[in-house]
Structure formats: C-alpha cells, structure tokens
Regions:
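Exposed acidic/polar residues on beta-strands and adjacent loops within beta-sheet cores, strongest
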Residues: 3-190
C-alpha cells in the first residue's frame, strides 16, 4: 500500500522556466518526499495541492490561515555581528558550524548583501499549541511575496518560498504537520 504522506505531487519542467518552455514541457509527477535531496534533474514549477490564501500585514510579516491552521512568517533585519562565516575554495559560504548559508552573494563582500533573515515561522493548528518551524537559520533575504502555503489534504502542509536574488537565489520547501517539521528541502531552481 502506498502512503501518500511519503509522496509529493509536483509540477516539473526540464527546460529553463520561461513561460514558452513551460507551456510545452511542463508535466505533473509524483516522487517520494525523501528523494528530494541536493539537486534534481528537473525544475520544480509548482505543486498539485490547494493553495491557502495569504495577506501581508506589515512589510516584514505575512499571515496565512484557513479553518485548520494559522501560519505567521516574520522577517527581521540581519544583525551581521551575530554571524561568523567562512568561504570554501569554491566560493560557497558556510557558517562557522559548517552549515550552508543561503541567499547571499558568493563573493568576499557577501555580508554586505545580507539584509533580511527569517525571524520566525510560527505554526498554529486549531486546538494545538503553536510551535516555531525549525531549520530556518541561515536562509537570508527571503522574499515574502513568494511565500506559498499548500494543504496536502492528508494532515500535512507545505510552505514554499524564494530567497536571495539572481545568482544568490534559492528556493525552500518545508513539509510539516501538527507535530512538527517532516522535510526541509533547499534548492536552486536554475
């Protein structure tokens, strides 16, 4: 028997993400959730789940809710003195603890490009205690207007957003339920 909580329904493309290419080559597929690691041989264009409407309440805060869940996505200005980074021989930036840093410019002056960071993502399921979504540190310059939350209609939800800009851009996908984080997948969709 197939467990739908272990699968994810995606809209994918093998082309360059232009509208013209998407109209000709976009397709639906289902993959194992735990197979999303590193880079994939396709571009993730979207998801085959209902999107939950959202509204920005302030410049740095986004609220998303339906009858079962409330999600608050809040950013703050980066305090650069809170961070120590190192650059490897490939120009990739890592925190001193070895964790990869996302949403930066991979040059020696990358700290000048760190403007915003995720302050918190608070999730509240009806009748449950709220919790903060873990593993959001080192995801810099998130774009609030790109945040999308989807109801997987099996007790799980997904939040997808972009961060950074141009060559420093990234996408983040978090799958979660009322108990907490199930999967985090960070990728570059180019």
């Amino acid at each position: 028997k197939v467990n739908d909580k272990e699968l994810i329904a995606l809209k994918i493309d093998f082309e360059d993400n232009t509208i013209e290419a998407e109209n000709q080559t976009m397709q639906d597929t289902i993959v194992k959730l735990n197979s999303l690691k590193g880079s994939t041989p396709f571009f993730i264009i979207g998801y085959n789940y209902p999107k939950i409407p959202h509204k920005v309440t302030e410049d740095n805060e986004l609220l998303i809710s339906n009858k079962d869940i409330k999600l608050e996505f809040v950013t703050k200005k980066v305090n650069k003195s809170d961070y120590k980074f190192k650059i490897n021989k490939y120009g990739e930036v890592f925190a001193k603890n070895g964790e990869r840093v996302w949403g930066y410019s991979d040059t020696q002056d990358f700290q000048d490009h760190l403007e915003a960071e995720i302050f918190y993502i608070r999730i509240t399921f009806v009748g449950k205690e709220p919790y903060l979504l873990p593993k959001t540190k080192y995801l810099f310059n998130p774009t609030l207007s790109s945040v999308r939350v989807y109801d997987r209609e099996n007790g799980q939800y997904m939040i997808d957003f972009m961060g950074g800009d141009g060559a420093e851009g990234y996408n983040a996908l978090f799958v979660f339920d009322e108990k907490g984080l199930i999967k985090r997948y960070l990728y570059r969709n180019f």
